[in-house]
Structures are given as C-alpha cells and as structure tokens.
Design a protein with these regions (language model features):
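N-terminal transmembrane alpha-helices
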Residues: 2-40, 53-68, 72, 97-104, ...
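Transmembrane helical elements of multi-pass membrane transporters/channels
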Residues: 13-32, 134, 145, 168, ...
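Small-residue-rich hydrophobic transmembrane alpha-helices
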Residues: 45-105, 142-161, 267-331, 364-386
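Membrane-helix interface/capping residues of multi-pass secondary transporters
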Residues: 33, 42-45, 82, 111, ...
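Short runs within selected transmembrane alpha-helices of multi-pass transporters and secretion channels
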Residues: 66, 135-153, 164-169, 190-205, ...
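Short alpha-helical transmembrane segments in multi-pass integral membrane proteins
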Residues: 1-18, 73-140, 182-236, 293-360, ...
Length: 439
C-alpha cells in the first residue's frame, strides 16, 4: 500500500488527491443549488438547502465507517495482517448496504413529517418534498460512494479516487442540466440526477475492488460486532464534522427564518454551499494524511507521524490564507453566482453575511486537522470532543445566544466564536498527546 517514497512526496500525493476529491464532491450539492436557482428560482434553492441536513447524515455515516475502517485497515497492513484487513473491508460494505436500504424505506414512509421537521413550509414545502423524493432512492449510493472513495486511497490508488469523483461530478452536471432545463423536472429532477451520478461512482469503485489489482478485497467473513467498539469512535470524529454541519444548517435555517425571513434563508443557503466547499477542503488535508499517520503510528514511528503533522499545518495555513482572502475580497461575486444582479439588495445582504460568517475560516482548518490527527493516532475521545465542540456545542450555543441578545445580522458571528473556543481545546489535547509520546 505505502511504499518507501519520501514522506513529503507521499503526503502531497495523498492530500492533493483527497482535497481534489472532496472539493469535487462538494460540487454535487453546489451544482444542484446553482442550477435550481437559475432554472427554478432562489426560493427553490432555499428549499434544497432545507434538505441538505439529510445528505449530511448520509455522508456522515459514510465518513464514520470510512475513516474508522480505513484507519484500522492501515494499521493492520502496517502490522502485516492482510486477512484481517480483507475481512473488515468486506464486513464494512455489507453492513453499510443494509443501513442505506433501511434509510430509503424510512424516508419514504415518513416523507411529509420529515420535510416539516427540516423546516419546509409555505413556498418551500413542495420543493422540499420533491427534492427528498428524488434523492431518497439513492441513500445507499451516497453512503457507499464516499466510503469506497476513502478506502481506495487506503488501498494505494488515490488517483483512481479523484478520477472517479470527477467523473461522477461531470455526470451530475450534465444530468442536472438535462433534468432541469431540458426535461423541466424541477427540483425532483435535480435530486434524481445527483443520485444517478452517485450510482455511477459506486459502480466504478466496485469494479476496482472486484478486480485483481487491489491490496484488499471481498472475502467471506464472520460478523465481528466487537470491532465497532474500536471502529466507530475512530471514525466518529470526522463523521461528526459532517453531521454537525448538517445539524448547524438545520439550526441556522430555523433561527434565520425566525429572525431574517425567507430572504435571510436565501443568504444562508449561499453561505452553506460555500462553507461545505471550504470544510471539505480542510477535511481533505486531514483525511488525506490520516492513512499515512496511522501507518507510521502502527509501525511505532513517532518521528514520521509528527513530521506529517507539521506538513499538515503548513498545508492548512496556505489554504486558509487563500480562502480567507478570497471570501473577504470576492464575497459579492460569490453571491452573484447564485443570485445574479437583478436583486441588488439581496445580493448586498448575502455578501455582507458571507464576510461576517467567513471570519471563522481563520481557525477552521487547524481545528479540523488537529481532530483528524488525533483520530489517526487512536485518540478518539479527544478527536470527538474537538469535532462536537467546534461543529455543534460551541456553535449552537453561540448562535442561540446571539439570536437572543443581538438578533438580525449578529447571528453570522456565531461560527467565529465557536472556532476560537474549539482552538483552545484542540491545542490542549494535541499538546497533551505529544508530551505523552515524547516521554
């Protein structure tokens, strides 16, 4: 899996592929939003945002099992225990298949109350129903496609992973355009097109693992439920980042509808799309380095995984500078991609909201990296604390406090407060681990 190339070369190879994969992966939802906004209307786009927590749940399940499985498999391979790696890989895919099919059934049974729970009402109600109806049949594909994308990188094929994700994204763009602008299928068509593109990526990944060039492959196995006591905590830290993103979108949607109305929801929808892209970029640096960190951790090579941590901070620092400057300078242009110039007041509000929200990007990447590193070296309690703190506890508390005390545009500062509090906690956990390993 991991050859003896220089550590920096391996880091750049894995991280570049993962960042590109996750950035492209983000385009699935962004393309939906953009084409729905242009082809149906901005309130239809806002309705799609109401359904985003559902896709966040699907991705979070995929991330939890992908990162946990990938981490343990990498450790097994570092210890030359290939049969255990094969068994865990096979068990993981079978279990997730059952989970995905169950979710599809539950969504269709409880479709209308689920849409109301997400915040659908008035002009957004039917749009949300239609979007969920088009997406739900492909719940399994959303979970499995991301899961296999991570595992293929652990198998030593990061280039195949990014090529497959790009293929799926291009298919999504084409199918979205056909569904919305040619067939006039509206938001249902956008959702169904996205699902079909996920199905395509699943098929490509399965061909790899059913072929003869992979390091680990499908085997007969006996279900080992005990492994999940180790696996889920390892993946939970990264998965909860995605899950908390969905929960916070849900909470923001509710608070914004109360404080700022439908136009505020449109502004936040744009922020949510930008935020997803930025979070996934930072997750790409974290997750791309995790198999390498776990491999060197499994070998007992402390110098190796500490050097990888330094590389990670350098990469995060560069990306943070580029992203922060881009958001601050080009906020009106970013908002204009979704809204156009025909509504200048709404465009100005969206740009101002994006700049206020974007202050959190100064610390976001470092917090995600520290949580991911602690996952890779089997420190799940610390990693989970960081992820839950930055993604939910601190941010939800700040949001509700600012909504009550300030209201209006003050709520956009909740994320930067959350990231600052999380940074203090993350640095403490990381320094404690490094001191312990140095002793």
């Amino acid at each position: 899996m991991l050859n003896e190339r220089s550590l920096l070369s391996q880091f750049l190879h894995f991280v570049a592929a993962t960042v590109a994969s996750l950035m492209v992966f983000s385009l699935y939802s962004i393309v939906d939003g953009l084409m729905v906004a242009k082809g149906v209307g901005e309130y239809a786009m806002a309705a799609v945002n109401l359904a985003v927590p559902f896709t966040n749940v699907l991705f979070s399940i995929g991330v939890i099992f992908a990162v946990g499985t990938s981490t343990i498999i990498a450790i097994y391979l570092g210890q030359n225990q290939g049969e255990k790696a094969n068994s865990l890989f096979s068990q993981n895919i079978v279990l997730l298949t059952c989970v995905g099919l169950t979710i599809t059934v539950l969504v269709f049974v409880f479709l209308e109350p689920f849409a109301v729970l997400l915040g659908a009402k008035g002009v957004t109600y039917q749009y949300t129903i239609d979007y969920l109806r088009g997406l739900a049949p492909f719940a399994l594909c959303f979970i499995i496609s991301y899961n296999m994308e991570v595992l293929i990188k652990t198998d030593g094929y990061p280039r195949l992973a990014i090529l497959t994700v790009i293929t799926g994204c291009l298919a999504n763009c084409v199918l979205d355009y056909i569904a919305i602008f040619v067939l006039n299928l509206g938001v249902w068509g956008a959702a169904f097109a996205t699902g079909l593109s996920q199905l395509l990526t699943c098929i490509i990944y399965l061909r790899h693992f059913l072929g003869g060039h992979n390091t680990f492959h499908f085997v007969k196995f006996r279900m080992d439920w005990g492994i999940y006591k180790r696996l889920i905590p390892l993946g939970f830290a990264d998965g909860v980042t995605e899950l908390c993103n969905g929960v916070m979108i849900f909470l923001f949607n509710r608070v914004i509808l109360r404080c700022l109305g439908d136009d505020g929801l449109v502004c936040y929808t744009i922020i949510a799309y930008v935020n997803t892209l930025i979070i996934n970029t930072m997750l790409g640096i974290s997750q791309g380095s995790q198999p390498l960190v776990s491999y060197h951790y499994g070998k007992g090579d402390a110098a190796g995984y500490k050097k990888l941590l330094r590389y990670g901070f350098t990469a995060v620092g560069i990306m943070t500078a580029v992203i922060f400057a881009g958001v601050m300078i080009f906020a009106p242009q970013i908002a204009g991609i979704f809204l156009g110039a025909e509504k200048p007041e709404l465009l100005g509000s969206a740009a101002g909201a994006l700049r206020r929200y974007g202050l959190c990007y100064i610390l976001l990447g470092s917090n995600i990296l520290m949580g991911g590193f602690l996952t890779a070296v089997e420190q799940p309690k610390a990693a989970i604390s960081i992820s839950v703190g930055r993604g939910l506890a601190f941010q939800a508390g700040a949001l509700l406090l600012l909504a009550a005390a300030v209201g209006g545009t003050g709520i956009w500062f909740a994320p930067v407060i959350s990231e600052a509090l999380c940074a203090v906690m993350a640095v403490w956990f990381l320094r404690r681990f490094l001191r312990k390993t140095a002793a």
